[in-house]
A protein has these predicted regions:
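Membrane-proximal, glycine/serine-rich, low-complexity loop/turn segments characteristic
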Residues: 1-2, 32-294, 357, 367-368, ...
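Extracellular/periplasmic, surface-exposed regions of secreted and cell-surface proteins
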Residues: 2, 6, 211-230, 263-316, ...
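Soluble periplasmic/extracytoplasmic beta-strand elements of cell-envelope proteins
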Residues: 2-6, 23-27, 44-48, 61-63, ...
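Conserved small-residue
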Residues: 61-145, 385, 591, 608-732, ...
Length: 925
């Protein structure tokens, strides 16, 4: 949605000091948000900052908060023997005679790990590692020749994560009036440390705000709002993504300890990493005039200038310590691989508005309000990047303090700009506040579109009927004190269609490279891409919204109810055009060829009652749901990834996930024997899954059996289209449904309590995360504490454990690939972990999002110290989950990211969702 702060569009709400905010209003229907233009296509959030009123006394407010964070959910490893045994089983099934990580063979490692488990209680924390002495004292590692063997069970959670990462915020403001002038000023500071225990990241923010308003005459008011925000981010810029590597191979490798004081690779890289620093400065100045020309006519003008400046600086340091293999410390990253870089991006924006309001009431019955105006916006953007290798000193990572050859230098730059303008008007009419009418219109232009398609007109309107104000409602007013029916229709144009110049074919440059065969010398050659095909007639996406609503106030508005049903249709969506023949040699250009329809509803119920001067209670509840359907798309109806425009098709519910329906595990009874090549012979009546096997994997007892939905006797995905999808079906949807929240709280004799609950009723996710499936990625060979219940079919060893109570099928390494099912390649996963109903992740949840308990001292006590108000409070965020649909999956249900994509198998290997405890105070002098 578009964020508008004091009438000015803002891209990032986090740049605003929360204590400066006076109110927040959300506009969802097109009729009310259309007046804000093309950037309001998905609603508007109106933020009003604090401003003194005429006659206000001067007061000073101070707010302070101190908090500590920890992770809500973290994965863990089982003991090391369990990890090794799982990897050995998986690789043995693949036909591998040996399993190793950098020379450590798991079958040789297993006896040491078993003895370590017998000789130690629990996991090992960070510290000096003990060498092997004998079988009665195996220590933590053993060097056999030049080959290290690591088998200690390190406590990854304790070593790497801080359970009390500190943060604090302070804010002081001065507000009041003097004569015809009102003012509000504030200064804020916020700092936060992340939960990474080793070389943690830090974030700081500084805010300064000045709001001034003065009556120059009795008819002319002028004002200015000046904001400055600095955000300072600093973190270790290590060679590896730490969250990827600490959860990649196992708790035994790579060790999180030291030998002779030397750290191992991952710890060393984190400790010795340079600090990546990002500084974001935002300057914003807004000046406005309001002229009351007559009693009914006002003229308004405002101008805003904003600069966003981003400066980044970092380096790649050399690293010394114990490497993947070897028995002595070494340069893990040598001096010749060091470098430093800097980049800067600067965005400058100005926005101007001029509008006239005319309000007139006739006979206290007919009320008119007419507004007309014009606005414009212009943005310019510049980017610069420079990098030079081989630092003289790690302590001074500056560009001019490097000695690398010039042919290794890198310099890059780019520039961009866009502009928009619009004429707008609004007419409001009501008759005695009962019959309500509003008409809006905008004529918008954007630089993103070619001549002839830059400008478009977007109308909207709404009607309302306050039936509770009618005479016939008098007898019901004590019960239903307020009632209004609403209907609105509106069109909004969306200009956010990708690049600033999507209708212009551009030639991209390729980083210079050595091409000796082309010029006969070992020098770099400049290269250029072929221009992409573009449509020369791109224009606005048109979003049409219908909204029907009912507002009720019950029992003198002690209870209020609001209900809305809406339909939002997006026409002329930017989408891939019709497929081009392969001989063209270019990708399909995007055109205004798509349509999407969304239908949804929202319900809010609020209750508030003041029982006595000392006791007041309240409760609020809201819930909403929506579903989007693709109604037009140029596609051959190929099914695939749920949120990929490349696979969208007419009739698709946006976010749908395709997959197999899981039947059960195969048992020996499903087969009659084996073929000469080792593949199983399916028993009569059992659908054959041979066609979806890949690599050396062969379905057998203990593996997943899919349902034969089309009755063909063969499990497949057909042609991967809507008309022929074999045994595939829609198994879920990755978009949230039934999002809800409720507040419960009250006040009693100075105490205040507020509990905020928030949740999602239904949401599915298919992922190839290693935290979901054991031995998912062949490069990892990892198994986690939530994955130790799996089938085993090793009759040659006398071990057969196949049970529907086991969480997972027989193990096999490397299941992250695309597989051999047409229609599922875009989603990924194969073997036992093709997309399917059994392992679809349930992301529904109900969370106590926040609980706050406060106490305000009696005024009789505080006024003696010239304090108007003094409040202390304690608060907890993300305290616990009352419902977690994903069960023992060690990932927070609000987690959406990972190192890499969901399909890469690393979902969850990122900064975790956190819970926090805090206390604070609020003082007004």
């Amino acid at each position: 949605p578009l964020i508008v702060v004091d009438g000015v569009p803002t891209d990032n709400l986090s740049m605003i000091n929360g204590n400066d905010i006076a109110s927040i209003t959300v506009l969802k229907d097109a009729a009310s948000s259309s007046i804000y233009g093309s950037r309001a296509a998905f609603g508007v959030i109106l933020v009003t900052t604090k401003q003194a009123k005429k006659g206000d006394r001067i007061s000073v407010n101070y707010n302070a908060n101190f908090a500590w964070d920890k992770s809500t959910y973290l994965p863990d490893y089982p003991d090391v023997p369990t990890q090794l045994e799982a990897a050995l089983r998986a690789k043995a099934r693949q036909g591998s005679g040996s399993v190793e990580l950098f020379g450590m063979y798991f079958d040789q490692l297993l006896p040491y790990a078993q003895k370590w488990k017998e000789q130690n209680s629990g996991k090992k924390g960070y510290g000096e590692m003990r060498p092997y002495v004998d079988d009665n004292n195996v220590g933590d590692y053993r060097f056999i020749g030049n080959q290290p063997m690591y088998y200690a069970d390190f406590d990854i959670q304790d070593i790497w994560y801080n359970n009390a990462a500190p943060s604090q915020s302070h804010d002081v403001s001065l507000t009041g009036s003097s004569g015809n002038t009102r003012f509000f000023t504030s200064f804020g500071y916020n700092s936060k440390e992340d939960v990474m225990k080793i070389n943690p990241g830090q974030r700081k923010r500084y805010n300064a705000t000045v709001n001034l308003q003065t009556d120059i005459t009795d008819w002319l008011t002028a004002g200015a709002r000046i904001n400055y925000t600095r955000r300072h981010f600093s973190r270790a810029d290590s060679w590896n993504n730490m969250y990827q590597y600490i959860w990649r191979w196992g708790s035994f490798f790579i060790p999180s300890g030291t030998i002779d004081g030397q750290d191992f690779r991952v710890v060393a890289m984190q400790k010795q990493a340079a600090r990546k620093v990002l500084v974001n400065d935002q300057y914003k100045v807004n000046a406005f005039l309001k002229a009351n020309v007559t009693k009914d006519l006002t003229v308004n003008a405002d101008f805003t200038w904003q600069v966003d400046d981003f400066n980044s600086k970092s380096a790649d340091n050399s690293v010394y310590g114990m490497n993947w293999s070897g028995t002595s410390p070494q340069w893990i990253v040598g001096q010749s691989n060091t470098d430093t870089w800097r980049d800067n991006s600067k965005m400058e924006t100005w926005t101007a508005n001029f509008y006239v309001n005319y309000a007139k009431s006739i006979n206290d019955a007919h009320n008119f309000n007419v507004m007309a105006g014009v606005n414009g916006e212009n943005m310019t953007y510049d980017y610069f990047y420079a990098q030079r290798p081989e630092l003289y000193s790690l302590d001074q990572p500056e560009l001019n303090l490097t000695y690398g050859a010039k042919n290794k230098w890198e310099i890059n730059a780019s520039t961009n700009d866009r502009a928009s303008a619009g004429y707008f008007g609004r007419i409001n009419y009501d008759y005695k506040g009962i019959y309500l009418l509003e008409l809006n219109g905008r004529y918008d232009g954007s630089s993103r579109f070619p001549a002839g398609d830059k400008w478009a007109f977007f109308p909207s309107g709404s009607i309302g009927y306050r039936f509770s104000q009618e005479a016939y409602w008098d007898k019901l007013r004590e019960t239903v004190s307020n009632g209004k029916l609403r209907f609105s229709y509106g069109e909004i144009g969306n200009e956010n269609v990708g690049s600033s110049w999507p209708y212009i074919a551009t030639i991209g440059t390729i980083s210079a490279s050595y091409v000796g065969w082309l010029n006969g010398s070992n020098t770099k050659v400049n290269e250029f891409d072929l221009p992409e095909w573009v449509s020369s007639s791109l224009t606005w996406e048109r979003i049409k919204t219908i909204d029907i609503g009912l507002d009720l106030g019950l029992l003198n508005d002690m209870v209020t109810v609001g209900f809305d049903w809406y339909q939002r249709t997006t026409n002329d969506m930017i989408a891939p055009g019709k497929a081009l023949p392969p001989s063209v040699g270019a990708s399909t250009p995007t055109t205004n060829s798509g349509s999407l329809r969304t239908r949804g509803w929202e319900l809010t119920i609020n209750w508030r009652k003041q029982f006595t001067n000392d006791l007041g209670l309240y409760a609020n509840f809201s819930i909403g749901d929506s579903k989007s359907v693709v109604t037009k798309w140029d596609n051959d109806q190929n099914i695939g990834h749920p949120l990929s425009t490349a696979y969208a098709y007419a009739g698709q519910v946006w976010g749908d996930i395709w997959g197999f329906e899981t039947d059960r595990y195969f048992t020996e009874a499903d087969f009659t024997g084996k073929n000469a090549d080792g593949s199983w012979i399916y028993a009569p009546g059992v659908a054959d899954q041979t066609g979806i096997q890949t690599q050396t994997f062969v379905y057998g007892p203990g593996d997943i059996k899919f349902k034969d939905l089309d009755g063909s006797g063969v499990i497949d995905g057909g042609k991967g289209t809507v008309d022929d999808h074999g045994d595939l079906k829609v198994i879920g949807n990755c978009l949230p449904r039934y999002e809800y929240s409720f507040h419960i709280g009250g006040t009693y004799k100075g105490f205040d309590l507020d509990l905020f609950f928030q949740g999602v009723g239904k949401r599915d996710m298919w992922t190839q995360s290693s935290f979901v499936f054991p031995e998912m990625r062949e490069a990892d060979l990892a198994i986690y504490a939530n994955q130790t219940s799996y089938n085993i079919y090793e009759p040659e060893k006398g071990i057969v454990n196949i049970s529907e109570s086991n969480a997972f099928p027989c193990l096999y390494p490397g299941n992250e690939y695309a597989g051999n099912v047409t229609g599922l390649a875009g989603e990924g996963g194969c073997h036992n972990y093709y997309p399917q109903t059994k392992y679809l992740v349930d992301m529904s949840y109900l969370r106590l999002k926040n609980v706050t308990l406060g106490y305000t001292l009696p005024v009789e006590l505080t006024k003696k110290a010239f304090v108007q108000k003094l409040r202390f409070y304690v608060s907890c965020n993300n305290l616990f989950l009352l419902h977690k649909g994903s069960g023992d999956l060690p990932i927070d249900p609000e987690m959406n990211a990972g190192q890499g994509a969901l399909g890469y198998g690393t979902w969850g290997r990122t900064y975790p969702t956190t819970k926090s405890w805090s206390f604070g105070l609020q003082v007004t002098f």
